[in-house]
Amino acid sequence: MTSESEPNTSLPFSPIQQTLPATPSRSTSQVSMVSAEALLSHSSPTKQLTPSHRSSLPSALPYNTLLNAPAGSPALRARASTASSSRAPSVLDDARVEHNDSETQVLEITPPMDNYELDGGSDHTSLPSDASSIKGKEKQRSNDRNEIETVGAGGEMALPSGDARKGLKELVRRSTTADKGYGGHDHRRLSEKLSQNENLQILITQSDKMSYSPRLYYVLTNAGKPVFCSHTRPSEDDVTNLMGVAQALISIFADDDDRLRYIIKGNHRVAFLLKAPLYLFCVSDWGEPEHVLRLQLEYIHLQILSVVSSTQLLRLFQRRSNADLSTLLEGTEPFLSNLIDCSQYDFSFLTSTLQPLRMAPALRDTSAAALMPPSKFKDLLYVLLIAGGHIVTVLRPRKHSIHPSDLHLLLNTIASSSALRTTETWLPICFPKFNPSGFVHAYISYVLEDVGLVFVSADREAFEDLRVWKDMVLEKLEQDKTLSRIQEAIPLHPYTISSVGCPGLRHFIYKSRQHVQITQPIWEAPYEDGSTNQKRLVTTYQKLHDAVHAKSGQASALKLVYISTEHEACLVWATKPFELYITVSPQLSKSAVVAAANNVAKWVLAEEGRIFLKDAPVF
C-alpha cells in the first residue's frame, strides 16, 4: 500500500489544482474485525448496484430533456435549479481566460512539424538518443537516471494488535522487501541500456500471466454510502460492506494527515482517488501503472461533476454529511458505464487528446466557415460539428480555450443517449475544466443520423436564438452538398495498418503535441477488440507512456523506450512535436524497428492535413 501527503496532480494539460478538504473521522469500533482481504479479493461480479427507483426512458422526449432522465427527475431539477439560481454571465466570471500563448489552447494554428528522423544503424549498435553525449560525471549521472527501479508491495499480513485503527493500518502497510519487475509483474527484470543517454531497453522474456479480468470501479461518499458500482452482478449488501471497508481504510490514513493511494496484493492493484465528499477506487489485475487507474477514476469524477457541479455537491454534503447522492444521479449510470468502456482502450483519454474525423482539409475548412457565429451572440462559448462520434471542427472565443477532457465528457454524454441524437435538446452541463462551479447550456441538434451541431452558451435563455441560427447554418452546409460529403466521410475515417505500407508493423499510436490530437489505425488481428492480445498491448502502451512522462516517480522522463516480449516488440519515441508508439513483430531487427518508426512519422506528416484539425477558427 502506498499513501501520500502531498496534493494530487491533475490531468495533463490542466492548470487546475483541486484542493482536497480534510476527511472527516469515522467511528471504527468494529474495524479490527474487518480483513483487508475483503477489499482485495472482491473481483467476481455478482449484481449491479442501481437506485431503488429507476424510471424508464420515455419514447418521445421534449427538447429540454436531460440526458435520459425522465422529466421531473432529481438530476433534472438539480441542474435546472443551479442554472436558474445564477445569472448566465456568472459562468464566465469564474472561468479561466487563456492567453494566446497558453498550452491549453488545444486547437491553435501551429507551425509545421520538424522533420525528426531516427537513425537505425546496425543491429550491433544501440538506438541513438537525440541528446548530445555526456562525459565524465555528467555521463555517469545520466546513466544512473535511466535506470527504472520498481518496488512491489508484498510480504506477510500482520495481525492487528492494541488500538484497532493502528492495527488495521499496520495490517495493510506496504512491505518493500519483494523485488518486482517492470510494471508490477513478478518475473525477474532483465534490462539493458541501448545507449549512454536517455534510451532504455526492457526485455521481458517470460510469458504474460495476467488474467485481464474486467476492472471494477466504485464510487462512495466520505460517509461510506455507495454511489456507483461498475459491474453488473454484486449483491447490494456485498457492495455496501466493501465500500465500508474502503471508507475505513481511507479514514484511518486521513487521521494521520495522509492519503491512501493504492494497495497491491499479488497481481491485483486497488487504486484510490479522494475527491471529498466523494471517494473513488478501482480494482485491476492488468498490471498497468498506478496513474492509469487514477486517471480513469478522475474521468469518472469529472463525469459526475458534469451533472452535479462541485459547488452544488459541496453544498449538499455541508447540509447533510450522510446525503444519498445516488438519487440525485438517477438516470446517469449509462454515461458512467460508457465512459468506463471507452477509457479502457481509447488512448485519447490517457493522453488528454482528441481524435477528429479523418477528412479532406478543404471540406473541413468549408464546414468551419459555415459555423462562424454572428456577432450578436455575446455569451456563445463553443460551436462544434460532430460526425460519427468525432469532431469535424470546433470554434471558440479568442480568449477561451477548450480542454480535451471537457470535450470527452460532452461527446460521451451524447454518445450514451439516443434521445440526445434524435431530439432537439437544451442541455445544462458543467464543464469541470472550464468552470467546476457552474453550468453552461448546450444546444444539441442532429441534422442527419450521424451528423450533429452543438452550440454551447453561457446564456440559459439563448435556446430560441440558437435554434433560429441552426437553421441558417444548416442552409449553408447544404450548399455545395457539404453536409452529404461530411456524411460520406464517416465510413472512410477508420484506416488499416496497411495504409502505411510498412512490413512487420502491427499497430501504432501517434500523438501530435502541437495539435493535442492523436491518430491510430483500427485494431486488427491479432489485436481484435476485447481480446487478451489487445488488453496486453494497451497495457504495454500504458507502461511506455509512464516511462516517457515519469508518472511513477522516476527521476526523469525518457525519450526512447523499447520493450520486447515473446508476443510483440513495442517502441515509444518522444520528441518535442510528437510521441510515437509502434508495435512490430518480435522477430524484427532493431534497424527494422527504427525504419518502421521513421516510416510512420513520415506517413503522418504527409497525411496530417486529413487526420488532424489544424486550423480551428476563433471568433
Curated annotation (Swiss-Prot):
Start-end of Low complexity biased regions: 73-90
Main location: membrane
InterPro entries registered for this protein in UniProt: FUZ/MON1/HPS1_longin_1 (IPR043972), FUZ/MON1/HPS1_longin_2 (IPR043971), FUZ/MON1/HPS1_longin_3 (IPR043970), Mon1 (IPR004353)
Compositionally biased residues, Basic and acidic residues: 93-102, 135-145
Domain of life: Eukaryota
Region of interest: Disordered: 1-145
Compartments where found: Endosome, Multivesicular body membrane; Prevacuolar compartment membrane; Vacuole membrane
Membrane topology of this protein: Peripheral membrane protein
One GO-annotated biological process of the protein: vesicle-mediated transport
Gene Ontology, cellular component aspect: fungal-type vacuole membrane; Mon1-Ccz1 complex; multivesicular body membrane
Ranges of compositional bias, category Polar residues: 1-33, 41-58, 123-132
Keyword terms, alphabetized: Autophagy, Endosome, Membrane, Protein transport, Transport, Vacuole
Function: In complex with CCZ1, is required for multiple vacuole delivery pathways including the cytoplasm to vacuole transport (Cvt), autophagy, pexophagy and endocytosis. The MON1-CCZ1 complex acts at the fusion of vesicles with the vacuole, through its regulation of the SNARE complex during the coordinated priming and docking stages of fusion, and particularly at the stage of tethering/docking.
Entry similarity comment: Belongs to the MON1/SAND family.
The name this protein goes by in its record: Vacuolar fusion protein MON1
Species of the source: Cryptococcus neoformans var. neoformans serotype D (strain JEC21 / ATCC MYA-565)
